[in-house]
């Protein structure tokens, strides 16, 4: 039986609508707490402890309180990190030997949305069977622990400082960032008090933008999903590079001094090239079904095996672990380097890119010389929840027409979002006009069939 609440990246939705309501989130905290309590060494008097971090959405206060109450009712202690990037929660959970970590965030979504995602004790996303166990507990009545067994809550002192030091530790000690002018766009999100300090303390001249959250402006015209603001700031300040994070700082986009934008596909290639130069070889790299074909071809040219996972960083992570590889990425900017961190981390990924540039004494454009991305057109089509797009003859006909016209010179990918009622239509072709024309034709068919 499929999961009812957990999607590809936890539980997410519009605040005030099921399941992102305070009563559900309280029960979710209780259910997760009972699952954790079942794995703790209760006989030895152990009490599970979880860490809760959040981004800057106004709803985070409400959901944090609900989660805290649910965990306490289950007899689980809580540590509160306050605003903290998703990868920061993963790191602190592992470093402090806690039972689990919880992030309250909807990542790159607007402030009206929010979500809950969990990390296991080792800083990894929960396995499917644990999520299923939590869902099973949601069906049971909430039976509050006795007063002497209620969980306690306290704030984690200097959570930001601990994570800042971890990020800096991933940058080679032989290098620093002196002489570099960097624009850092924090998307008015979880990294607003962290990312500028990381790069500044490594020596960079930092120009921060997107660092004035008010509860309502997260990802609004700034950050990795709206890089135009970063491009303008880089040009206006004559900066060497711009770094854009999203609301929970697990994804990255980079802009060079000319205003050229580099996505996760290109940055993966840069990191692979750097590893080849420093380690002599790379066993393999993982992308997704959306990864640009040009990057796959370029990696093959370097003798690096390449595997496409389903879209979603959890699936990239699964493929990396299965093969014992270290480097993987999505074009959206989720970059994984498993010898540095257990999950995607925008700040750490940016430091890896900067280290590669320092070691090679080359620019991003120079490192990507000879890699020309195939034009891609991506259209997100909102549809009614539960719409049967797979059974639509008109959508199938539009896809067949596009694939027939491209005839081996491009590809079509249609997939449903795992976090919202959206169908993503992607067409890749040798000519941008062809990609746009075919993507729009398919998107029109989707709108007609699912609206």
From Swiss-Prot:
Q: Which residues carry this modification: Phosphoserine?
A: 107
Any one Gene Ontology MF annotation carried by this entry is: magnesium ion binding
Which residue ranges run through the membrane? none
- Gene3D superfamilies linked: Alpha-D-Glucose-1,6-Bisphosphate, subunit A, domain 3, Alpha-D-phosphohexomutase, C-terminal domain
User: Could you say which residues bind Mg(2+) here?
Assistant: 107, 246, 248, 250
Xref: InterPro entries: A-D-PHexomutase_a/b/a-I, A-D-PHexomutase_a/b/a-I/II/III, A-D-PHexomutase_a/b/a-II, A-D-PHexomutase_a/b/a-III, A-D-PHexomutase_C, A-D-PHexomutase_C_sf, A-D-PHexomutase_CS, Alpha-D-phosphohexomutase_SF
Catalytic center at which residues? Answer: 107 (phosphoserine intermediate)
- Could you say which protein family the record assigns here? Belongs to the phosphohexose mutase family.
**Name of the protein in question:** Phosphoglucosamine mutase
**Organism of provenance:** Burkholderia ambifaria (strain ATCC BAA-244 / DSM 16087 / CCUG 44356 / LMG 19182 / AMMD)
């Amino acid at each position: 039986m499929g999961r009812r609440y957990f999607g590809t990246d936890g539980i997410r939705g519009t605040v005030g609508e099921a399941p992102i309501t305070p009563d559900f989130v309280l029960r979710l905290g209780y259910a997760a707490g009972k699952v954790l309590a079942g794995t703790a060494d209760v006989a030895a008097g152990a009490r599970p402890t979880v860490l809760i971090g959040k981004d800057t959405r106004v709803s985070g206060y409400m959901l944090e309180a609900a989660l805290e109450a649910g965990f306490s009712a289950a007899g689980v202690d809580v540590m509160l990190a306050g605003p903290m990037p998703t990868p920061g929660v993963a790191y602190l959970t592992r470093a402090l030997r806690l039972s689990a970590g919880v992030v309250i965030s909807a990542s790159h979504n607007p402030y009206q949305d929010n979500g809950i995602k969990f990390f296991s004790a080792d800083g990894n996303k929960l396995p499917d069977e644990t999520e299923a166990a939590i869902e099973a507990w949601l069906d049971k009545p909430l039976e509050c622990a006795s007063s002497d067994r209620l969980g306690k809550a306290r704030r984690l002192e200097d959570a930001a400082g601990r994570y800042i030091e971890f990020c800096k530790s991933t940058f080679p000690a032989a290098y620093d960032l002196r002489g570099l002018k960097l624009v850092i766009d924090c998307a008015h999100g979880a990294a607003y008090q962290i990312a500028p300090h990381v790069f500044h303390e490594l020596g960079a001249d930092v120009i921060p933008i997107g660092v004035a959250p008010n509860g309502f402006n997260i990802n609004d015209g700034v950050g990795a999903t709206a890089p135009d603001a970063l491009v303008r700031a880089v040009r206006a300040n004559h900066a060497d590079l711009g770094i854009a994070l999203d609301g929970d700082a697990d994804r990255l986009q980079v802009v060079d001094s000319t205003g050229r934008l580099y996505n996760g596909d290109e940055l993966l290639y840069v990191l692979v090239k750097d590893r080849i130069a420093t380690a002599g070889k790379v066993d393999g790299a993982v992308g997704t079904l959306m990864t640009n074909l040009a990057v796959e071809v370029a990696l093959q040219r370097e003798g690096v095996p390449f595997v496409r996972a389903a879209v979603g960083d959890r699936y990239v992570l699964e493929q990396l672990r299965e093969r014992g590889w270290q480097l993987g990425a999505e074009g959206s900017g989720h970059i994984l380097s498993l010898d540095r961190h257990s999950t995607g981390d925008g700040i750490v990924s940016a430091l890896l890119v900067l280290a590669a540039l320092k070691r090679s004494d080359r620019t991003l454009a120079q490192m990507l010389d000879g890699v020309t991305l195939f034009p891609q057109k991506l259209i997100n089509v909102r549809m009614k929840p539960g719409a049967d797009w797979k059974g639509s003859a008109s959508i199938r006909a539009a896809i067949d027409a596009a694939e027939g016209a491209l005839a081996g010179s491009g590809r079509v990918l249609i997939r449903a979002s795992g976090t919202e009622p959206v169908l993503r239509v992607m067409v890749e072709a040798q000519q941008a006009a062809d990609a746009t024309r075919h993507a729009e034709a398919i998107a029109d068919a989707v709108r007609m069939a699912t609206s």
